[in-house]
A protein has these predicted regions:
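Short, Lys/Arg-rich flexible segments
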Residues: 1-150
Length: 150
């Protein structure tokens, strides 16, 4: 085995400078970019994160609607979704008042759930992959090298 210690001090100094929060926020920011694209796909396909089609609109709603797509009248809802990594977690937000009602549904208002924000097994795996890569890249940023001769 050949081990080079060149750059170990620089690498460890750099890693000491990175806080847990910074690493988590970097990973969550990347995951937010991934999930943002997935959410746009849900609006395009009119399906929830597990691939189930959204409930159709009522005939009354279709009659007064200007768009031929569910949850897309002006596009404001789909454009409003944003991700905010903060304190080691990520918040998925929208300033649109009716976003929560459509995502979770409302028995009182007789609006069925049309989920566009949800966490799937695929999302979990992607988060794990991103977190591993962010850590791996953080540790390999210096010139420390380990090579095995076989």
């Amino acid at each position: 085995m050949v081990t080079s210690s060149s750059g170990i001090k620089e690498t460890t100094d750099r890693l000491r400078g990175l806080t847990r929060k910074e690493l988590l926020e970097a990973a969550w920011r990347e995951w937010g970019n991934y999930k943002g694209k997935k959410i746009q796909e849900y609006f395009d396909t009119e399906a929830d994160p597990r691939g189930n089609r959204w409930h159709d609109l009522s005939p009354y709603t279709w009659a007064r609607k200007k768009s031929s797509k569910i949850l897309t009248e002006t596009g404001a809802l789909r454009k409003s979704i944003r991700f905010e990594p903060k304190g080691g977690v990520v918040f998925i937000k929208s300033d649109i008042a009716y976003a929560r009602t459509h995502n979770f549904g409302s028995a009182v208002k007789h609006i069925p759930q049309r989920e566009f924000v949800g966490f799937t097994e695929e999302d979990r795996k992607m988060a794990e992959e991103i977190f591993r890569r962010v850590l791996r890249e953080s540790f390999s940023a210096g010139s420390f090298a380990v090579r095995e001769n076989r």
